[in-house]
Amino acid sequence: MNRPAWMTVAGCLLAWGLAAGATSAHAATGRPPNVVLILMDDMGWRDVGFMGNEFVETPHLDRLANRGLVFTQAYASAPNCAPTRACLMSGQVTPRHGIYTVVDPRQPPGSPWHKLRAADSRSELATEIVTLPEALRSKGYATAFFGMWNLGRGRTGPVTPGGQGFDTVVFPENLGFAKDAYFDDDGNQLSDRLTDEVLGFMERQKAGPFFVYLADHAIHAPYDPEPDLLAKYERKPAATGDQRNDAAQAATIEAVDRNVGRIMERLACLGIADDTLVIFTSDNGGTSRYTPPLKGGKGELSEGGIRVPLVVVGAAVAKPGTTCDVPVVSIDFYPTLLELAGAKPPAGQILDGTSLMPLLGGRANLDRRDLFWHFPCYVGRATPSSAIRAGRYKLVEFFEDGGRVELYDLSADPGERQDLAAKSPDIAKPLATRLRAWQRATAAALPDGPNPAYDAASDRPRGGGRRDAGKRR
């Protein structure tokens, strides 16, 4: 396997080290910047070093953070993978595109622990939606997709990446990997091989502009870590406090970190690091056993299920090495990248996000806005719910309990330990009213009445579906 360390070529190290002070080609020529969007699978808010994880080693991501802008209150648009990916491609909240979960949510007549019949969920992104790559192609971008799609079945056709705006498409299966496998039969690692393909594409398209969407399978369970990395973390002393100490997970994350380093090295070697905006984030939070100090995990609208790491580096970042505490959400990427590219919003298509260009440019805040999430389905232990965040307060509505709400002050209580709904009705009631008005305005699907198969004595699943044991080669 090709495993170069960060900046193995001295000239590349110098090139990226000076990038922040260089005059970019896009600024000099008017050509739009390149974009590399790296989306991880199930990576929690605190699963990387630059967010305070002291057990896993992520030197390349930490370097990215030191050279970029870290968003400390970044959110996925949904608590599980497919809807977040649909939000990224459409720029719309989940009720508009109708994708709420990656699996069939209804499971007729319903699992015995489901009190309600889950709302229906689309299995593919509607072709009428103008996707982000389609919008960028209108400005001359070469577009490429690598990894997991989850927005339509098949390898060719209108609902696949090739039919939704990507010129180049590479699935794991194209590289000889079985579904959900971390290694192929020859011992090649998936993150390495996907990155090989990304590097080749960037080399071919170095004249730009290009848009790369790398949707890695990592760090989805079951893990299958590289033996040498696994042994390293099994020998490593445990971190203290609420730090996670999962050797298999840490080894999987370090392999991802290595490949982020390879991408940044290649951008520098090609002389286009300063002409490229790199975004690194995750599709949802980790699982409830892996998200401290946050509560809950994947599938849930608690902070542990939707808060994610986010770092942006390169073109348009005015103050490298800084942090931003403004709450942002992944539907913001679509309008941000349109503005970066100088592209107009698609005619007749609602975009629910807000451009982050002012924040990237050094502004301290955005205009005040509410953030919304809607999940009328079941995944793991998660039940149908909807949420609003307005400033420091977040309110969650639980549909199983007749619309019961919980209210949290995230500034004082980011772990959501103290429910303020009963003691602060003056805050909870207006937020609930705004949330329900938003549900009506977006025609949000709701659970479809009681589940006839419900059995109060049945046991719920033990978490968000993550398994510790990996598939061994």
Question: Where do the protein language model's features map onto the residues?
Answer:
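Active-site segment of extracytoplasmic enzymes that catalyze sulfate/phosphate-ester chemistry
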Residues: 46-131, 135, 141, 155-156, ...
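Bacterial N-terminal signal peptides
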Residues: 8-21
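Short, solvent-exposed turn/loop segments enriched in Gly/Ser/Thr/Pro and often Arg
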Residues: 51-54, 70-92, 100-106, 145-159, ...
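Long, internal low-complexity/basic segments
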Residues: 25, 29-33, 40, 45, ...
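C-terminal cap/loop subdomain of S1 sulfatases and analogous C-terminal strand-loop tails that border
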Residues: 285-292, 298-301, 318-322, 326, ...
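A short beta-strand-to-alpha-helix junction
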Residues: 31, 53-57, 75-80, 103, ...
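Active-site regions of oxyanion-processing enzymes, predominantly non-cytosolic
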Residues: 30-34, 88, 140, 144, ...
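Histidine-centered active-site microenvironments of extracellular/periplasmic hydrolases
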Residues: 56, 156-165, 222-225, 265-318, ...
